[in-house]
């Protein structure tokens, strides 16, 4: 059973370009009006935590759902560290490369639709991930760019992160990357 996707959206960008709005409009996600309205016990994608999403998270996502906060990358660290309260299972996505026109080729700065597709793919919902990405002309390019990484992540192998970061200490490398991304977006 495909996980239900819940999104709390902060109006920090152009709504005409917002991928979360399109996910909701086409029935792939449900918009909630506050962080408290996100389901307790759901997996929440949080770029500030150390624990990556893995295929073993599938069971939780199927029963409790997948939650996201749609916000500007410039404010992502503040939003995720200050506002997430409650009983969520916090996971970050493993390192991937953006295919969206705004951040094309940049590591980790994924749009909401890319994040949802990546999570679905990693948890074994590959067809559903492709279906979501087809909402945009550039969407399937996300899979093309990241195919070898997504396949390894979907098999539970997180070693591509070291390869993409070029460091052995993934936690430290991601911390440095987040600092650069949130200051220079």
UniProtKB/Swiss-Prot annotation:
Keyword S-adenosyl-L-methionine set for record: yes
UniProt catalytic activity: an N(1)-methylpseudouridine in rRNA + S-adenosyl-L-methionine = N(1)-methyl-N(3)-[(3S)-3-amino-3-carboxypropyl]pseudouridine in rRNA + S-methyl-5'-thioadenosine + H(+)
Entry binding sites for S-adenosyl-L-methionine: 19, 69, 93, 108, 112
Function recorded in the entry: Aminocarboxypropyltransferase that catalyzes the aminocarboxypropyl transfer on pseudouridine corresponding to position 914 in M.jannaschii 16S rRNA. It constitutes the last step in biosynthesis of the hypermodified N1-methyl-N3-(3-amino-3-carboxypropyl) pseudouridine (m1acp3-Psi).
Subcellular location field: Cytoplasm
Organism: Vulcanisaeta distributa (strain DSM 14429 / JCM 11212 / NBRC 100878 / IC-017)
Signal keyword on record: no
Cellular component GO terms held in the UniProt record: cytoplasm
Protein's name according to its UniProt entry: 16S rRNA aminocarboxypropyltransferase
Family listed: Belongs to the TDD superfamily. TSR3 family.
UniProt keyword terms in alphabetical order: Cytoplasm, Ribosome biogenesis, rRNA processing, S-adenosyl-L-methionine, Transferase
NCBIfam families recorded: PRK02287.1
Main subcellular location of this protein, as a coarse class: cytoplasm
Any GO molecular function: S-adenosyl-L-methionine binding
Record-listed E.C. numbers: 2.5.1.157
PANTHER family, sorted: 18S RRNA AMINOCARBOXYPROPYLTRANSFERASE, RIBOSOME BIOGENESIS PROTEIN TSR3 HOMOLOG
GO biological process: one example: enzyme-directed rRNA pseudouridine synthesis
């Amino acid at each position: 059973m495909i996980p239900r996707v819940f999104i709390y959206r902060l109006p920090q960008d152009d709504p005409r370009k917002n991928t979360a709005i399109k996910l909701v409009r086409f029935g792939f996600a449900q918009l909630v009006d506050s962080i408290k309205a996100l389901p307790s016990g759901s997996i929440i994608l949080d770029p500030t935590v150390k624990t990556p999403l893995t295929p073993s998270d599938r069971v939780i996502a199927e029963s409790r759902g997948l939650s996201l906060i749609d916000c500007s990358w410039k404010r992502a660290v503040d939003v995720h560290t200050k506002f997430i309260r409650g009983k969520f299972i916090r996971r970050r996505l493993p390192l991937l490369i953006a295919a969206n026109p705004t951040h094309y080729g940049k590591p980790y700065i994924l749009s909401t639709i890319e994040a949802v597709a990546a999570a679905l793919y990693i948890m074994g919902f590959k067809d559903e991930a492709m279906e979501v990405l087809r909402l945009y002309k550039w969407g399937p390019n996300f899979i093309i760019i990241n195919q070898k990484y997504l396949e390894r992540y979907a098999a539970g192998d997180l070693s591509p992160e070291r390869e993409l970061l070029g460091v052995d200490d993934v936690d430290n490398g991601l911390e440095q990357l987040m600092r650069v991304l949130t200051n220079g977006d």
